[in-house]
């Protein structure tokens, strides 16, 4: 039998924090394998999804083939604490503690537990379905005014946490082990037992190798049926030598493979003058921050202490004997299923020079030390500017490893990062996973406000308390100052802005600024009686920052920053699993968000920077038209895909008065959408649209979220065929449950062209908005 790392290596100071109410205090299990005081129940819970592949489950045929639960867990004991937008999860082993802190509706919903809400009156008109939907959605609002969700989908995040915990000798509580096992067992591919890049993807070496290792860290033995099946798939795909760069990096940190198999990530690039075209400051912020920490670790060539588990893994994840592997010869080995963006000749040449000449023979120690010091300083600035939350749960565990190497296991930086890593964890009906960011708090709250306003209900006393709490949350989450020394750490201005999640995370995004500001203006200026929480100066701060996002060459908007480098930089894309990650790109979604918000702002403050605002709108819409595809649609980069972006493209045109009747661009956009409407009235698009850049129907049929996007775009463009719209509205209303809920369907979001990610609240915010808009425009039309 393979042994796991002994608990003697895990000091109490390294325990995972924030497990309030865990009876044993340190998370160790008692003699029967259960945490002290734990009462097990049947962990198989009712699924909250329809018969489609989705964030919360696969279809019924596949569902019967899935491992339901690795170890039973009493899901009534989980609580999510929302503290000023920060989400942390707590398992209350003690009965008295659980009674003092009862589960909220949101907790139960996340867990897939029954809410036992009463059935509402069946809707006769779209407005009835709107109210029913809001009645359910209101139950999910958290005390701080926002909505939480599992922002999950990518499969490489959880292994990064697991490997970091293990490599840095951090105690992993038993309840974490159980729930991680449960989640990964549930998410194994129903046919071959592997894991993909994301939860709906086919098995890859990246997903299978890393999640196999994560399960071994959690104590699953190699002869477990789930592991033997996954290992067989991994070997069929070529074994861990054929993993992409990021997986090889994590396996080198763990000591499962040697660093010679990891292509270089030279920290010396940070020493280049800023004017050099390939300097990392020009890269897209996510790849920049990942490279930052990765370059420090690979430069140190640090691996954790070897033990029995690591030695065993060396014999499990490779096809050939570990001792005979040509590590350097396999630097570029990669499974075809992982190789979405093959390395270019330029990158391969650079890697060869760095790996075979520069690093072993020419690299002076003083350059190495200087580069590591530069990177180390930038990591410190990242932690200071985010209170250790970091940009995302991708670079955060890497930063922890950096600090563990540099500062030692008991340092403040290591302890604080361990605490902050809790922010990325989410627990759902399947178990414990890691989100793509520390949440979607500000983003989802803005769309919730817009859904109510678009439905004409902002002034309805029934919904005012919900909206006032949402407004208060956006008030609290506005970022009030720029980053200290932002030029030195290459950060974009952010004063007055909003982040995707929370102000503590602090990375402003153009569309997050736009949608939050729009929502504030809608309630404070368009509706009546709402508190004026943001005064004019704070509104102006947001506009000032928003205006900095326009690309001076084209007029479009990117995401975190203006483009700093050209698309040719993709020749240096070393990730292999993603496309379009090296630099910022211009997006119809981000550009539209800015256009619509500035147009609304202009209505209420016509004199503030009037010429600049007008010029921004004019140039942005001009770019939107150039981004339209020949078939009439727009390509979406942040959700799936043409349906999503075409909604935004039509919204941009409508903002300047261009609609189906008077605009060729709007008419083509509408015709593209209606050409994709299905017989049942809905729309359906598969994530392969993002990968292949062509419209691909979802095999499971129509989806409520995509139907809502299509309807919103068509109504904004004043598409004249009301019957087509009515059929789409009837489809959405027909999927609504008696208590007002919509069940989870297929995954909604995407990033970097190839990786899906879930936005579970979209099935409320966009469906309610579509139904509400229809009810406002056609009040006499029934379902």
Residue ranges and their predicted role:
Residues 2-783:
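Preference for long, amphipathic alpha-helical scaffolds in soluble/luminal domains
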């Amino acid at each position: 039998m393979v042994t796991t790392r002994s608990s003697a290596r895990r000091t109490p100071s390294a325990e995972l924090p924030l497990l309030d109410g865990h009876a044993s205090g340190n998370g160790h299990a008692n003699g029967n394998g259960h945490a002290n005081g734990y009462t097990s129940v049947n962990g198989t819970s009712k699924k909250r999804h329809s018969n489609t592949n989705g964030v919360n489950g696969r279809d019924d045929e596949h569902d019967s083939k899935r491992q339901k639960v690795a170890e039973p867990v009493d899901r009534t004991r989980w609580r999510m604490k929302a503290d000023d937008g920060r989400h942390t999860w707590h398992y209350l082993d003690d009965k008295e503690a659980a009674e003092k802190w009862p589960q909220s509706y949101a907790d139960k919903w996340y867990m897939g537990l029954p809410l036992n809400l009463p059935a509402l009156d069946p809707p006769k008109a779209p407005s009835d379905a709107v109210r029913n939907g809001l009645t359910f959605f209101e139950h999910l609002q958290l005390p701080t005014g926002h909505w939480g969700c599992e922002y999950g989908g990518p499969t490489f995040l959880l292994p990064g946490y697991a490997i970091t915990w293990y490599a840095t000798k951090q105690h992993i509580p038993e309840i974490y082990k159980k729930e991680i096992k449960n989640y990964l067992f549930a998410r194994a591919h129903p046919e071959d037992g592997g894991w993909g890049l994301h939860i709906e993807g086919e098995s890859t070496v990246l997903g299978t190798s890393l999640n196999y290792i994560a399960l071994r860290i959690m104590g699953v033995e190699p002869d477990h049926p789930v592991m033997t099946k996954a290992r067989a798939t991994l070997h069929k795909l070529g074994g861990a030598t054929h993993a992409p760069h990021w997986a090889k990096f994590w396996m080198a940190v763990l000591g499962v493979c040697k660093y010679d198999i990891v292509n270089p990530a030279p920290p010396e690039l940070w020493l280049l003058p800023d004017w050099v075209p390939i300097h990392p400051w020009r890269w897209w912020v996510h790849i920049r921050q990942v490279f930052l920490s990765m370059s420090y670790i690979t430069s140190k060539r640090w691996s954790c202490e070897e033990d029995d588990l690591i030695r065993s893994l060396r014999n499990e994840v490779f096809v050939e004997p570990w001792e005979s592997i040509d590590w350097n010869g396999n630097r570029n080995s990669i499974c075809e299923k992982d190789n979405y963006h093959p390395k270019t000749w330029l990158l391969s040449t650079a890697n060869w020079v760095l790996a075979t000449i520069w690093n072993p023979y020419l690299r002076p120690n003083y350059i190495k030390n200087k580069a590591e010091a530069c990177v180390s300083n930038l990591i410190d600035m990242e932690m200071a500017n985010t209170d250790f939350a970091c940009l995302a749960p991708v670079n955060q565990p890497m930063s922890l490893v950096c600090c563990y190497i540099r500062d030692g296991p008991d340092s403040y930086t290591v302890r604080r990062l361990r605490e902050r890593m809790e922010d990325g964890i989410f627990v759902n009906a399947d178990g414990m996973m890691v989100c793509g960011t520390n949440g979607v708090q500000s983003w989802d709250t803005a769309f919730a406000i817009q859904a109510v306003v678009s439905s004409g209900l902002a002034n309805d006393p029934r919904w005012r308390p919900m909206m006032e709490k949402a407004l208060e949350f956006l008030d609290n989450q506005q970022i009030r100052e720029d980053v200290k020394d932002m030029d030195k750490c290459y950060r974009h201005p952010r004063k007055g802005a909003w982040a995707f999640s929370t102000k503590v995370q602090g990375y402003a995004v153009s569309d997050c600024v736009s949608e939050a500001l729009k929502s504030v203006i809608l309630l404070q200026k368009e509706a009546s009686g709402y508190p004026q929480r943001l005064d004019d100066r704070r509104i102006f701060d947001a506009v000032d920052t928003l205006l900095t996002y326009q690309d001076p060459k084209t007029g479009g908007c990117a995401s975190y920053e203006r483009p700093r480098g050209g698309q040719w930089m993709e020749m240096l894309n070393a990730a292999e699993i993603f496309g379009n990650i090296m630099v910022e790109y211009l997006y119809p979604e981000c550009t539209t968000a800015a256009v619509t918000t500035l147009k609304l702002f202009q209505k209420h403050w016509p004199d503030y920077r009037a010429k600049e605002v007008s010029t921004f709108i004019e140039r942005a819409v001009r770019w939107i038209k150039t981004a339209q595809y020949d078939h009439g649609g727009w390509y979406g980069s942040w959700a799936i895909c043409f349906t999503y972006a075409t909604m935004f493209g039509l919204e941009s045109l409508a903002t300047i008065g261009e609609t189906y009747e008077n605009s060729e661009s709007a008419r083509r956009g509408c015709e593209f959408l209606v050409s994709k409407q299905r017989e049942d009235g809905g729309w359906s698009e598969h994530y392969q649209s993002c990968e292949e850049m062509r419209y691909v129907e979802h095999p499971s049929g129509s989806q409520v979220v995509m139907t809502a996007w299509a309807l919103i775009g068509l109504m904004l463009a004043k598409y004249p065929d009301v019957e087509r719209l009515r059929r789409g509205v009837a489809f959405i209303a027909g999927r609504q449950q008696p208590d007002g809920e919509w069940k989870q369907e297929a995954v909604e979001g995407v990033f970097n062209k190839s990786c899906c990610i879930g936005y579970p609240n979209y099935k409320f915010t966009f469906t309610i908005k579509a139904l509400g808009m229809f009810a406002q425009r056609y009040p006499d039309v029934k379902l």
